[in-house]
């Protein structure tokens, strides 16, 4: 597992109050992990802070699963 993947999963678990082992790559933040709209905003903010990047709102709306978050970070930190 890449360190980015591990860090994203840790943040998701902390922000959404779920166990890290429940955070699967294909998991949807809303449907599988029980996030609401406020949770998703806070999650994006936590990812921005962790990876010292800014995620534009139009991109943040597309990040709906753990894997999409990992992909976004990988593509935009390079």
Swiss-Prot record:
GO terms for molecular function, please? Answer: acyl binding; acyl carrier activity
Where, per the database record, does this protein carry O-(pantetheine 4'-phosphoryl)serine? 37
GO cellular-component terms in the record?
cytosol; membrane
UniProt-listed Pfam families: PP-binding (PF00550)
This protein's pathway: Lipid metabolism; fatty acid biosynthesis
Q: Which PROSITE patterns match?
A: CARRIER, PHOSPHOPANTETHEINE
Its PTM note reads: 4'-phosphopantetheine is transferred from CoA to a specific serine of apo-ACP by AcpS. This modification is essential for activity because fatty acids are bound in thioester linkage to the sulfhydryl of the prosthetic group.
Provide the function of this protein: Carrier of the growing fatty acid chain in fatty acid biosynthesis.
Family from the record: Belongs to the acyl carrier protein (ACP) family.
Name the record gives this protein: Acyl carrier protein
Q: Which organism is it from?
A: Saccharophagus degradans (strain 2-40 / ATCC 43961 / DSM 17024)
